[in-house]
């Protein structure tokens, strides 16, 4: 079911500015969503510019297909495969910028039928692409208690992960859960301590969603792929919404900005050092949303934008 959800793109201008758009450049919007970033990129491109957008959500694809612009094309799939999409178009090493807006989008959260939200009752799904893979309900019904506990602790940073996992497994033995409200109620009942400022299901829903969609692996693969597709001087502009995402992006940009680490005292010739390769990226810093943006869109509060540039190495 698709409705007209109001969607405010977080750090819109800042993320696109980070790409340093050239009118004749070739760019990738790896998370089309509802098209906020893509439309702004297109507005800054000239007649020779190109934009390739990617999204694994069929609803996002439906929105993208309404854009009638010869400079624009859309791919239905995960952004982890961006190197493949670029290679198919003979654009490897020619991309001038990649933008990624990570995590779940507001339209996905706000549509109860997608099953992402503990605030709205809907099918316990949580897949960004409902046509592929296991739903959250299917995974929770078949996974071992220890595996569920590990996911909740690792991807939700939830200290009561074992207790919640036990409650989920016990409930599913009695009657399998198929609704988000059922899961939220089981989590709330299992929590020995309540956080006054956070719904008890927040961390567990995040963890299950990340696991079902392989979100962190997707990010890691996309970042690795970016090095092979970016042209020298090409930009990475990446928005994260929680510490697990941002940690991966921060570590990647830092490591690729440092170049190969050679232990002190090991003699190496200039030719050997050159063979190891130089810095792949130059980190250009991070930006956070201003007070005004957070006031208008509270979901922007935790967002972090990191920008890096491909070197000539």
From Swiss-Prot:
Keywords: Cytoplasm, Methyltransferase, rRNA processing, S-adenosyl-L-methionine, Transferase. InterPro entries: RsmH, SAM-dep_MeTrfase_MraW_recog, SAM-dependent_MTases_sf. GO terms for molecular function: rRNA (cytosine-N4-)-methyltransferase activity. Disulfide bonds: none annotated. The keyword Nucleus does not apply. It comes from the Bacteria. S-adenosyl-L-methionine binds at residues 35-37, 55, 79, 101, 108. It is found in: Cytoplasm. Belongs to the methyltransferase superfamily. RsmH family. This is Ribosomal RNA small subunit methyltransferase H. The gene is rsmH.
């Amino acid at each position: 079911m698709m409705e007209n959800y109001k969607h405010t793109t977080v750090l819109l201008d800042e993320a696109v500015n980070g790409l340093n758009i050239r009118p004749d450049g070739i760019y990738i919007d790896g998370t089309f969503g509802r098209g906020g970033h893509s439309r702004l990129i297109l507005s800054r491109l000239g007649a020779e510019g190109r934009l390739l957008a990617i999204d694994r959500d069929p609803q996002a694809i439906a929105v993208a297909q309404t854009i009638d612009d010869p400079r624009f094309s859309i791919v239905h799939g995960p952004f982890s495969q961006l190197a493949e999409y670029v290679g198919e178009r003979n654009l490897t090493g020619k991309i001038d910028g990649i933008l990624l807006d990570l995590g779940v989008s507001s339209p996905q959260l706000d549509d109860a039928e997608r099953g992402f939200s503990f605030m709205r009752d809907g099918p316990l799904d949580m897949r960004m692409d409902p046509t592929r893979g296991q739903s959250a309900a299917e995974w929770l019904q078949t996974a071992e208690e220890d595996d569920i506990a590990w996911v909740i602790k690792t991807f939700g940073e939830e200290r009561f992960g074992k207790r919640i996992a036990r409650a989920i497994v016990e409930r599913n033995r009695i009657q399998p859960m198929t609704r988000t409200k059922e899961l939220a109620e089981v989590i709330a009942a299992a929590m020995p301590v309540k956080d006054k400022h956070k719904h008890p299901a927040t961390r567990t829903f995040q963890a299950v969603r990340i696991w079902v969609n392989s979100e962190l692996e997707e990010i890691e693969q996309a970042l690795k792929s970016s090095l092979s597709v970016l042209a020298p001087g090409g930009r990475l502009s990446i928005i994260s919404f929680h510490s697990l995402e941002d940690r991966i992006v921060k570590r990647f940009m830092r490591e690729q900005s440092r170049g190969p680490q050679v232990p002190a005292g090991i003699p190496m010739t200039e030719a050997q050092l050159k063979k190891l390769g130089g810095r792949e990226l130059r980190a250009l810093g991070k930006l956070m949303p201003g007070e005004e943006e957070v006031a208008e869109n509270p979901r922007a509060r935790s967002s972090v934008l990191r920008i890096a540039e491909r070197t000539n190495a």
